[in-house]
Amino acid sequence: HEKDVSVRFVDKAENIGKPDLIIIKKKKNTIGDLIFLGERDISKEILKLSRHGMMIIGICGGYQMLGRQINDPDHVESPNDGIHGLGLLDIVTTFSREKQTYQVKARMLEHGHLFPVDNELAGYEIHMGETTHNGHNSIRPFARITERAGKMVDILDGCVSASGNVIGTYIH
């Protein structure tokens, strides 16, 4: 417990206020959660705050929501073939039926405004699908996974926007 830290869950745009940071995560399913954010105008508020430099972090499904598009060709989460994301990161996610679950260790590559470069991170990945970007310089990888399920690897994870205030990662 940190004395100067408080966390709030928000279900309406007007309840966001002026936080130091917004964390977006998946609650039930990514597409349904993205629809929920749109129906409650939370998406619009997140976009507005991002334009003003607010730190936005998307974890797992939240990372996927930050992208341009989520494709669901096998209808894993939805009867729809896909949905437009928030567009804060130039990435596209395509769902698959296979769930990936791994314990991981990683090193930070980009700090945005919060994380020291080369800081070690331990956590886990649990997601369905693959996220790709178009290779433009508008985003940079967030971390380098060095160990996955007890095996040494060299895998880039997540991304940081060019402005440094939007970060996405699969690492919980």
Per-segment meaning from a language model:
Residues 1, 31, 160:
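RNA-binding accessory domains that recognize and position tRNA/RNA substrates
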Residues 2-18:
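A short, well-structured beta->alpha microelement
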Residues 7, 12, 103-171:
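C-terminal and late-domain segments of enzyme folds
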Residues 14-16, 93, 130:
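Residue-level detector of flexible, active-site-proximal loop/helix-junction positions
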Residues 17-18, 52, 162:
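Residue-level preference for short coil/turn positions at secondary-structure junctions
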Residues 28-122:
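Cysteine-nucleophile active-site neighborhood
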